[in-house]
């Protein structure tokens, strides 16, 4: 829980050792301490994420930091989002189409579910919210990357309908040709909008445990 002091204390100690241990490894391009933190509070979470960013930069100033991949960013060198809409046109609208009353698309201005804390002030007879934090939204000065998209469910034979045993995103592609067609439409859409987006990462080419969303089988 990134909203607790105890979690922050333990993670900071471990993360410091991780960065120092792997500092010179050539395969590391970007530090990504967190993934999909969607439920931040307004006090401990911003402090914790900022501390991790600062600590990582102090140890290794040479690499960019994607502080919270696909989640609620506070301070970061790369702004990242995750979205698994399967229809390429709908995905384009979500990522790039300006919304009414805004100069940006929804995904640039959205905020995740903030967890407010009710605290009692001394001498006050009822709980009041005394934590207030203005979460940042994307600004074009830093790279914007869709670092998770796709996840196309692909089962060519004997599809399993029980999501506890097998799952992926969207309706299953029943042949490799169906899979490639859907994948191509998504990738082409992103390339056509390359002036806005800096990069993207397809998830994923191989099956993982119960996820059947790759073109390479788990075995």
Language-model segments: which ranges?
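Active-site mouth of glycoside hydrolases
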Residues: 1-90, 99-107, 136-141
């Amino acid at each position: 829980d990134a909203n607790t002091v105890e979690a922050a204390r333990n993670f900071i100690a471990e993360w410091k050792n991780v960065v120092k241990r792997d500092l010179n490894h050539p395969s590391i391009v970007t530090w990504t301490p967190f993934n999909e933190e969607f439920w931040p509070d307004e006090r401990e979470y911003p402090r914790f994420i900022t501390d991790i960013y600062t600590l990582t930069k102090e140890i290794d100033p040479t690499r960019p930091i994607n502080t919270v991949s696909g989640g609620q960013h506070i301070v970061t060198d790369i702004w990242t989002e995750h979205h698994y809409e399967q229809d390429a046109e709908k995905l384009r609208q979500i990522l790039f189409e300006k919304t009414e009353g805004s100069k940006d698309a929804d995904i640039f201005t959205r905020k995740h579910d903030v967890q407010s804390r009710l605290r009692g002030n001394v001498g006050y007879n009822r709980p009041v919210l005394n934590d207030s934090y203005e979460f940042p939204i994307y600004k074009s000065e830093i790279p914007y990357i869709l670092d998770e998209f796709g996840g196309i469910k692909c089962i060519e034979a004997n599809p399993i309908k029980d999501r506890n045993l097998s799952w992926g995103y969207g309706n299953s592609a029943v042949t490799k040709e169906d899979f490639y067609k859907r994948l191509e439409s998504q990738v082409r859409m992103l390339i056509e909008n390359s002036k806005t987006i800096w990069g993207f990462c397809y998830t994923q080419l191989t099956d993982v445990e119960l996820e059947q969303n790759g073109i390479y089988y788990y075995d």
